[in-house]
Amino acid sequence: MARVCQVTGKAPMSGNNVSHANNKTKRRFLPNLQNRRFWVESENRWVRLRVSNAGLRLIDKNGIDSVLADLRARGEA
């Protein structure tokens, strides 16, 4: 399973660890993903999503029905 948020599309980025001596080594910045179940009242069922913390905040703000409608319009759910 890819480390990608199903709501926002956030994915890992690459960058550098930088030491005090300014030596740089490559690293990955991973999104803060959580596996969550959401109760969808209109469908009377649970929906599992792998979402980032930003995705959770979007769901809190807009509602799960709105977010699911956007996902289905994109063909992802």
UniProtKB/Swiss-Prot annotation:
It comes from the Bacteria. GO terms for biological process: translation. InterPro entries: Ribosomal_bL28, Ribosomal_bL28/bL31-like_sf, Ribosomal_bL28_bact-type, Ribosomal_bL28_sf. GO terms for molecular function: structural constituent of ribosome. One of its GO terms (cellular component) is cytosolic large ribosomal subunit. Belongs to the bacterial ribosomal protein bL28 family. This is Large ribosomal subunit protein bL28. It comes from Burkholderia multivorans (strain ATCC 17616 / 249).
